[in-house]
Amino acid sequence: MTNFEKFLDKNSVFKNISVLSPHYIPKILPYREKQIEEIMSYIAPTLKNQKSRNILIYGKTGTGKTCSVKKIMEEFEKIQSNARMHYLNCRVYNSKYRVLQKVMKDYWPELEKAGFGLPFIYEKLLETLKQQRYLIVVLDEIDMVKDLDDLIYTLTRANDESGTGGLSIMGISNKLSFKENLDPRSKSSLNEVEIVFQPYTTEQLQKILEQRVEEGFQPNAVKQSAVNLAAALTAQENGDARYALKLLMRAGEIADEKKKNFVDDSDVEEARKRVETDIIAETINTLPEMHKITLHAIAKLSLNGSKYARLDGMAEGFLMSGEVYEEYERCCRQLRKKPRSLRWYKEYLNDLEMLGLVITTPSSKGIRGQTTLIKLGHEPEIVYKITNTSFFC
């Protein structure tokens, strides 16, 4: 009979693999002390029963935004006060209703049950603020909220209506331009402070990896050249620390598979191929269903080739928006799902582009009529394999 002993006794280059997880928050966040101090200075008044400024935090994926905010939340919660920070991932809580319900459930447990309307939940928010409570609502990937203008207006209006207490918004976004899509009323009501997280340099990534190697690997288990290579490869891409950590973790797993007691450059090179597919799969598998069907349609057409490929002005690999929508409708019928309207389809494309899964561009003058051209952001074979497995496994 198989038991766990052989796995527990197995030699490994790892000492504590969880240290390499993107969810792990180290005691010290290198190269983010300045941003952490700045954010803390803006929200400190909340701990003295004063409303703090709204904050928008920008930066590419893997620049330490979420990790820094969670570190701040740890420190915030150590101080006894009427203030609380509420963290929400807007890929999950992607509407005004979901955001308000999630925040208010912490004060009014009965809201856990379905069936409460938005006006009732809003009244509970006002009641909470009137109890001299101070809230900071952290909206990670704030761009993913469908009715963001309504949400911002509602949250800022609550301050005026309650008369006491205070609610502040802390938005986190990968897109510096996301505010351009807000209506003037929302922009005006925010009155926010903006903080930017720059991508890590090669040298900074080296130091971050060295810190995690010390905590997560056995002594002398990772060659310095492997750390340097992982940092250099990551800096070439986009300075994403999460990518660098995943690269190192995969390299360690490969070394274990080979029964080696150290990680070298060859393991990092092999890990690079696996990690790229892993990251694409993670992003795709967390997509809402209709987004995933849209992406599946694009991948399928990309493999089969556009029927308009021979048109003048049609760049290689690009598809016309209309043919993608037709394929999306076919995929929906095949899956026995009701296709959404063109308006919703365009929203899906915008979201997929924001995640780097597709590239869109207006058509050139050589193509009759004005349309949007669409291209996958990754290899069609990889994307199709992931989406096809998701729907037809």
Regions found by a protein language model. Give the residues of each.
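A short, basic N-terminal segment
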Residues: 1-52, 75
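Mid-core helix/loop region of P-loop NTP-binding domains shared across ATPases and GTPases
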Residues: 4, 8-14, 21, 52, ...
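Conserved beta-strand position immediately N-terminal to the Walker
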Residues: 55
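A short hydrophobic beta-strand->loop->alpha-helix junction that borders the nucleotide-binding pocket
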Residues: 58, 85-94
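P-loop NTPase Walker A phosphate-binding motif
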Residues: 58-83
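Conserved C-terminal helix/linker of AAA+ ATPases
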Residues: 254-280
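Short alpha-helical segments that sit at the start of domains
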Residues: 277-315
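Terminal-proximal interaction/regulatory segments of ATP-powered molecular machines
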Residues: 306-393
